[in-house]
Amino acid sequence: MWNIKEEDLDQFRITCRNRLSPEGATGFMMGTIIFVSLLMFFIFVALVTDGWDYYSTFFDKIIVSIELVLYSLQIIFLILYLFPKARYKFQKLQTLVVILYAFQLGTITFTALVLPGMTDYSIDRMTLICVGLLFIGAVIVHIVTTIDTFKQASEGAFSMDERSQSFFSETKERMIKGSMVYNLVLLIIIYFDNDYDFDTLILYVVGTIVMHAVAIGAAEFQLLVYCRFKFKSFHMTWEENERIRKRNKKFKTKNK
């Protein structure tokens, strides 16, 4: 579909060795797990005090079950990647794990809003439909931005020559503007359907912004997965990383 060449990804390779390096990805994982844990705490408290009977509907039980499975996987992978050598030995797997973390980060706020006990506000059928549409919108945004990112990569947008372009292309800008209108309409419907106060509306706005920001940013993660699995230059061994680290340390010491 796309003829992505390794030599056309010099700029993205630099990004992968800095912000998207195994250490950078582990930092993202740690930040995400802290945020997610704050909201998962309410689920654990409800299960410990009242058991599964606290979640009366089949929908609630399904959502809680999914969140528990995802959270358990996140904990397991985080423990694995806390070991420096494991980050490099399993760095291809780590790219997939980062996408899992991104999904959890983007959706956990709405989990907090729709499950009973996590807020003091009731959720009716219309609100659930609107939340579902917000999620579908984010999925569409992610698909379009991912396709556009791969198209940019095939055209040399992430190279270091005259073809170099910003990650935020015209396609992404149009998608962002369109999603803003789409999300605004759904948020207005949620607000008037439930007669929420302003503070609750802010939670929905924040959740929407986070979800769509992750949907757009995760397109870069998808390209990282592709590059790590296909191109050797995107795969750094532990020994190579140690040599570079020692060289940089020696250079900094020399310049002091």
Region locations from a protein language model:
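C-terminal transmembrane-bundle signature of multipass membrane proteins
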Residues: 174-256
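Membrane-water interface of transmembrane alpha-helices
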Residues: 2-3, 68-81, 138-158
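Juxtamembrane inter-helical linkers in multi-pass membrane proteins
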Residues: 150-171, 232-247
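Alpha-helical transmembrane segments and their membrane-interface junctions
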Residues: 39-45, 105-127, 179-203
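N-terminal juxtamembrane cytosolic/stromal segments of multi-pass membrane proteins
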Residues: 1-31, 229-256
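C-terminal halves and exits of single transmembrane alpha-helices
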Residues: 77, 95-121, 252-255
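Cytosolic-side membrane-entry/anchor segment at the start of a transmembrane helix
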Residues: 66-104, 158-170, 174, 227
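Alpha-helical transmembrane segments
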Residues: 54-67, 122-144, 207-212
